[in-house]
Amino acid sequence: MNIFEAYNSTKRALESAGIEDYVFEAKQIIKHITGFSNSEILMNYTNALTAFQQNNLTAIIKQRQLRYPLQYIFGEWSFYGRDFYVGPGVLVPRADTEITAEKCLDFLKAVKNPQILDLCAGSGCIGITLAKEREDAAVTLLEKFPEAARYAEKNIKRQSAVNARLLTGDVLLGDGGDKLYDLIVSNPPYIPKNEMKIISVSYTHLTLPT
C-alpha cells in the first residue's frame, strides 16, 4: 500500500465511522505515521508504507472508529505553532482557543513585564504560549488536578518556557497566592452534566462534567 492508497483508505474508514472532519483527520494521520509534511506527502505519494507504518495506521483507525480523540492517540497537538503533549485528563488545544491567546496578547501590548495567571491550566498551552510570545512576562500556571499538571510541567520543559512556573492547587482555596496580576486567563474543560448528552462523543473524552 502506498501513501496515496493509505490516505484514501483512511478517509473511507473514518467517513464510514461517522467522523465529521474525516478528510482533515485522514491527512493528519498520514502525516503522523510517515513523518512527512503536506508538501512531502505530495512529492512522495507513491512511496510504499513500511509494515510498521501500516500496523500503526490500522491501530490508529481502530481507535478513532471508537471515537477516541485523535489528539490523545497522537499524544500531542499543535497550538499557536507549537506542539504540546496531551492525553487523558487535559483539554486538547483547539484552533478556536488560539483566539483567546491572541486577545490576551493584544491586551498586554501596553503592559511592560506583565504578571500573568493561567487558571485551570491543563496542558498549559495558553499560559506557555503567552510566556513564549512575551519573554518579559512572568507566567503562573495553576492546575488543580495532578494528572493535568504533569502535562503542563512536561510542556513547560518542552517549550523551554523559563518565565513560566507551575502551581498545583485550587484557586478557590487560595492556592494561587495573594500576588497581583495584570492578566488572569482561564479556559476550563467543564461542561454541565445535562449538556454532556448532546455533544459529540469525542468531546466527552475531552471534558469534565460539573
Sequence positions of predicted segments:
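Conserved AdoMet
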Residues: K31-D106
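Hydrophobic pocket-lining residues within nucleotide cofactor-binding pockets
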Residues: T34, V171, L208
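Conserved small/polar residues in nucleotide/adenosyl-binding loops
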Residues: T204-T210
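Conserved SAM/SAH cofactor-binding pocket of Class I
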Residues: E98-I198
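A general structural signal for well-ordered alpha-helical segments in protein cores
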Residues: Y7, A26, L57, R67-L70, ...
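Conserved RecA-like P-loop NTPase ATPase core
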Residues: I29, N187, Y203
